[in-house]
């Protein structure tokens, strides 16, 4: 099975549990402990994107691998005039659409079932997100290049660290469930952006413990 199909299958099965990571009040004390210390970066990334989002104007967002729409809906609530969320999991997109409707931002959010490589758009975005997206790509450079082409502003993308204490358990979990996951060194991330024409002076990395988040200015 190709990696895209393995990832799709994994998140179709795991959509409800993944979305629940963001719901502190609905979990047992043990589940809160596990999510905070093992998967806490998921929520930390949301806080970081909030802090880096534009605050003025009619700005737009492309959210690649949008999952249950937590980032898309949150940014629409914070003023984004146009949000395009893209994912390969119908189950995830169903959650995203329900969340947008529940928060009264459905008219500003569009959710598309597609792989990024098959996506066709004729617009550019002020902010493009690849949060929890590059974890699951065997050949990330094509997707990163396309994301930059769709952006006139900033790309924010997370990359799980290659050398981090949670790597062995995460590798094992995906291996046992038939999924695919990859990890990155800081040098590899810098090379990826350099290969698509983003020099070091337009890129910085934020260390979130388990992940690096790259913030690249696209001109």
Kindly give the residue locations of the regions a language model identified:
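Class I SAM-dependent methyltransferase SAM/SAH-binding core
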Residues: 62, 70-116
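Conserved class I S-adenosyl-L-methionine
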Residues: 1-53, 58-65
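A short glycine-rich, Lys/Arg-flanked "PGG" loop and its adjoining helix->strand segment in the class I
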Residues: 141-153
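Short alpha-helix
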Residues: 180-197
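A short SAM/SAH-binding and catalytic strip from SAM-dependent methyltransferases
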Residues: 127-138
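Short, glycine-/aromatic-enriched active-site segment of Class I SAM-dependent methyltransferases
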Residues: 162-180
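Conserved beta-strand signature within the Rossmann-like core of class I S-adenosyl-L-methionine
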Residues: 152-160
């Amino acid at each position: 099975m190709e990696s895209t199909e393995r990832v799709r299958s994994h998140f179709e099965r795991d959509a409800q549990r993944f979305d629940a990571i963001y719901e502190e009040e609905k979990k047992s004390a043990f589940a809160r402990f596990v999510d905070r210390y093992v998967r806490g970066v998921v929520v930390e990334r949301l806080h970081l994107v909030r802090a880096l989002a534009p605050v003025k104007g009619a700005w737009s967002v492309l959210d690649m691998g949008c999952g249950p729409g937590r980032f898309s809906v949150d940014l629409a609530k914070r003023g984004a005039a146009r949000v395009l969320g893209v994912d390969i999991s119908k189950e995830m997109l169903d959650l995203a659409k329900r969340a947008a409707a529940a928060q009264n931002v459905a008219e500003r959010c569009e959710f598309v079932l597609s792989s990024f490589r098959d996506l066709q758009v004729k617009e550019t975005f002020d902010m493009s997100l690849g949060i929890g997206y590059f974890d699951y790509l065997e050949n990330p450079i094509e997707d990163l290049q396309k994301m930059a082409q769709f952006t006139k502003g900033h790309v924010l993308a997370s990359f799980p660290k290659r050398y981090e204490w949670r790597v062995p358990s995460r590798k094992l979990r995906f291996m046992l469930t038939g999924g695919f996951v990859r990890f990155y060194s800081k040098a590899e991330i810098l090379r990826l952006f350099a290969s698509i024409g983003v020099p070091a002076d337009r890129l910085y990395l934020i260390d979130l413990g388990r992940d690096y988040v790259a913030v690249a200015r696209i001109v």
